[in-house]
């Protein structure tokens, strides 16, 4: 397990998780989320290739439509 910060809150997740795993862990739709790791915004095609590490600061911005 590793400790990191997701949206400012400490989280403990499995070692080897990629960004897509983190998004799914928090039950978010990856098609409506923008992910930022340590201040770097990722493109959606990098979610599966980018591993999260101990101490990372992850921001998940979930877009919700409405009217």
Predicted segments with their positions:
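Cytosolic Rossmann-like ligand/nucleotide-binding regulatory domains
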Residues: 32-38
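Short alpha-helix capping/helix-loop boundary micro-motifs
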Residues: 42-47
